[in-house]
Amino acid sequence: MKKILNFIVEINLAIIISLFTSDFILWFAIILLLILAWHHINEYRLLKYLNLKQDNKFSLLQLGTFSQTEAYHRHQIYKEKCASLRLLSQINKNIKYLPDAIIICQHNGNISWCNSIAPQMFDFCWDKKVQENIFDVIFYEQFKHYFFSPKKRRPLVLLTYNQRYIEVQSHAYNSHMILVIARDITDMIHLLNSRQKFLSNINHELRTPLTVLQGYLEILADNNIQNPLQKKAIXAMQEQSQRMEHLLQQFNFLAKIETTSDKDFRKFDMSAMINSLRKDTDILNTYNHHIEFIIQPNIIIFGNESQLRSAVSNLIYNAIKHSGKQCHIQIQWETCEQGIKFNVIDNGVGISPQHIPHLTERFYRVDESRSHLTGGSGLGLAIVKHTLLQYHSHLNIESTETKGSSFSFIIPKRFVISKNNKEIQ
């Protein structure tokens, strides 16, 4: 369009110039030929730049330059279209055989496209010529609420009529389309349920004999045994039975955090809760640490108090028991840009870099001998990790050997309540 307009302007200019001459037709023809020659030279230069000359005999005097330029332009468009079609074909082929069901639909639910897994997963027949609505395919009411919900922080898990667990996610594909991805997680759910059942059975089967054993040990301890070796043996058995009881409690606590869907979130003063742990730290402080609390007062949290208490106390307990002797430990609870930050800092022995990625794994210990001496179970940081997942947070660990460690996490603003009982924005 721009070229046509330029050509019209040039013709008009040639007419105007020719009007001021004695022979209009002659001068108009001359000017028109000059314009055509100028365009011809420019087109030739363009072709030379694009290196489209097929042989060395091609010259400036050769005609057909215009058609070659136009052909090149069309050829480039054709190549781009072919490349796009090949890419779309490859993507379509890859998506078609993915193990997940993929559905592209409009905002009203009308399906525009789906891969071969979707009809198998949701038991429907799809044809491009027949209009199908996603709410007739995934007909569960909770999916409809999830589909139209503006905030989708987590995938939706559906229990279908044939007892299959389907995890569904929806994302805006573009301004007109919605991308729905569904995955069958039945085997994963059954595996988690089996593990939970196994852990519950282990917990129950160990707790009963442990209670009996502790009862008999208490009777023996009350008999005023004079033999020092026997007294030492009974004290050691009592200590180990208490350690086993603590391990079972942590085991059970971790299992509940992982599997319970009811979060039981309530408003509570977390600043006061952290301050209440001062007495416990004094009792646990057998290595004469200098423990400093820097707590911002009156911070109200919407969350599970017992779980957060366990997470905070585990971090403090680890610093006291594993940082070394006579260290400076600082416990911070202050506002930050993202929300509220809890941080436990010490200048103790530190941790080697290769251990840091594994610290939140169950039963992982940096030093087995030291953990047995201090009574560590290897479950404390795993409890912290799974507790923080409920607040969309994570445990940040920084440590340098011989210089100390820092264990911190941030509670996001949406879980923090201001003094007028509103979420901090």
Curated annotation (Swiss-Prot):
Keywords: ATP-binding, Cell inner membrane, Cell membrane, Kinase, Membrane, Nucleotide-binding, Phosphate transport, Phosphoprotein, Transferase, Transmembrane, Transmembrane helix, Transport, Two-component regulatory system. The modification Phosphohistidine is found at residue 204. It comes from Haemophilus influenzae (strain ATCC 51907 / DSM 11121 / KW20 / Rd). The lineage of its organism: Bacteria, Pseudomonadati, Pseudomonadota, Gammaproteobacteria, Pasteurellales. SMART domains: HATPase_c, HisKA, PAS. Residues 201-415 form the Histidine kinase domain. Its main location: membrane. InterPro entries: 2-comp_sensor_kinase (IPR050351), HATPase_C_sf (IPR036890), His_kinase_dom (IPR005467), HisK_dim/P_dom (IPR003661), HisK_dim/P_sf (IPR036097), PAS (IPR000014), PAS-like_dom_sf (IPR035965), Sig_transdc_His_kin-like_C (IPR004358). It comes from the Bacteria. It is a single-pass membrane protein. This is Phosphate regulon sensor protein PhoR. GO terms for cellular component: plasma membrane. The gene is phoR. One of its GO terms (molecular function) is ATP binding. It is found in: Cell inner membrane. Residues 89-156 form the PAS domain.
